[in-house]
Regions:
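Short, well-ordered amphipathic alpha-helices
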Residues: 125, 206-210, 301-304
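C-terminal cap/substrate-recognition subdomain and adjoining C-terminal extension
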Residues: 2-20, 228-409
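Intrinsically disordered, low-complexity acidic/polar segments
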Residues: 73, 132, 164, 324-326
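Intrinsically disordered, serine/threonine/proline
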Residues: 1-158, 352-409
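Short, low-complexity, polar/charged sequence segments that are solvent-exposed and flexible
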Residues: 82-85, 123, 132-134, 160, ...
Length: 409
């Protein structure tokens, strides 16, 4: 029997009515805002958010967004809760610019693109016969059609130096998000920044080891998928850099309101869609899929195992609450049973060390990396959970009378 999580749903007619109402309101608000901005000169493009792209010897796939607001810049060491809250507001109050003509260049080839209604651009650049750089990353460039706002766009090179690829979730897979504790999750999202958010211990060393492969010299690409909105892209990219997690293309979700992507629609199916696209785009590679038990990753990755078979090397589902048996564990274990007949190993794991030990047995990483991962995981086991740490921090501020930096760490 197919495992199903317990979930309450709104009646279909109520959901449809709410969607239509909010979509209509959103369209009117967007239209009014753009008329106001055009009247007072506030709709001019000021920033091209060029997301990390990926490609191979034949070309590259690139995406990004044109905004009428300047970039926020990285987090500062002295940012307090108010700075973080204000920056979060600025991220979600995005002033996208539709209908902007762009010129994108890569390996000497130039193409034109135009932003859509939400300010996004997407382009495929074919570069047959053009030399491919030996580096793991190569830069494309994107600019307005008149040449202004010239912006570099990093392109991950998937070349002969890769044995396999990694597709990983983000929340509670590499980044502590406490997605099951809404109070802590809200505090982390709104009152923290890329510098104060915490990685899962051992994740950075594990992902670097997977990228380097069994011999320690490979260039295996790492991709990230998440149900978080594109508005958080800069925070996630900064977070990876600050915590030495291998950078890679990040595929997020547009929370714009239309029938295809209504903000309140449940589900994480776009993760599977992105995984399918990557697997098809790079047919030479086999894949390692990493997720967590807090969302639907087990179900989605099980579908990938059934669909792609031997092209999936392994599936690892992090237990968001290891040591405690709960319905989520049974849900994940049910999908593991479903996958058992595919010959794809699928495991529910407690931490990065469990992933590393199994991956070592498959010949996916070098044994020398285990000691570093084990040491980081051991430190994490002695640390309080995020809800416990948040409660302790709040108590300390009450005792000391220091409430000027709530949420900071």
């Amino acid at each position: 029997m197919t495992p199903t999580p317990s979930r309450r749903r709104w009646p279909a007619h109520v959901t449809k009515y709410l969607q239509e109402f909010v979509i209509d309101a959103d369209e009117h608000l967007d239209s009014a805002r753009r008329r106001y901005a055009a009247r007072f000169g506030g709709d001019a493009p000021k920033h091209i958010a060029a997301y990390r792209a990926h490609g191979d010897a034949g070309g590259a796939d690139l995406s990004g967004r044109v905004l009428a607001s300047a970039p926020l810049g990285g987090p500062k060491e002295d940012d307090g809760w108010w700075d973080n809250l204000l920056n979060t507001y600025r991220r979600f109050e995005s002033d996208e610019v539709p209908g902007v003509a762009l010129e994108i260049a890569f390996r000497g080839v130039r193409v034109r693109a135009t932003t859509d209604a939400e300010g996004y651009y997407h382009a495929r650049i074919d570069t047959p016969g053009a030399p491919m750089s030996d580096a793991l990353w190569e830069n494309a460039s994107v600019a307005l059609a008149d040449g202004t706002l010239l912006t570099p766009q990093p392109v991950l090179q998937v070349g002969d130096g890769a044995d396999f690829g990694v597709i990983s979730d983000i929340d509670d897979t590499i980044l502590h998000s406490s997605i099951l504790d809404w109070k802590t999750a809200a505090q982390l999202t709104f009152l923290h920044n890329a510098r104060t958010r915490k990685p899962l211990r051992g994740a950075a060393t594990l992902y670097r080891a997977l990228q380097a492969g069994a011999g320690g010299t490979r260039r295996n690409p790492v991709f990230y998928v998440s149900s978080s909105p594109w508005n958080l892209y800069d925070l996630l990219d900064d977070f990876m850099e600050l915590n030495a997690i291998p950078p890679g293309p990040v595929f997020l979700r547009d929370i714009g309101m239309d029938p295809g992507k209504f903000v309140k629609t449940a589900g994480h199916g776009h993760k599977l869609d992105r995984a399918r696209e990557l697997i098809a785009r790079h047919p030479r590679l086999r894949w390692v899929l990493v997720g967590d038990s807090g969302q639907a990753d087990a179900e989605l990755y099980a579908a990938a195992a059934r669909e792609f078979g031997e092209r999936i090397l392994a599936i690892y589902i992090r237990d968001v609450d290891p040591g405690t048996e709960d319905p989520r564990d049974a849900f994940v274990d049910g999908w593991i049973e479903q996958v058992a007949g595919t010959a794809v190993p699928m495991l529910r794991v407690a931490d990065s060390l469990a992933i590393a030990e199994h991956a070592l047995g498959l010949g996916l990483l070098d044994a020398a990396s285990l000691d570093g991962i084990a040491a980081e995981v051991q430190r994490a086991r002695a640390r309080p959970t995020l809800p416990e740490a948040a409660a302790d921090e709040a108590k300390e501020k009450v005792v000391t009378g220091d409430v000027s930096q709530p949420g900071a760490s």
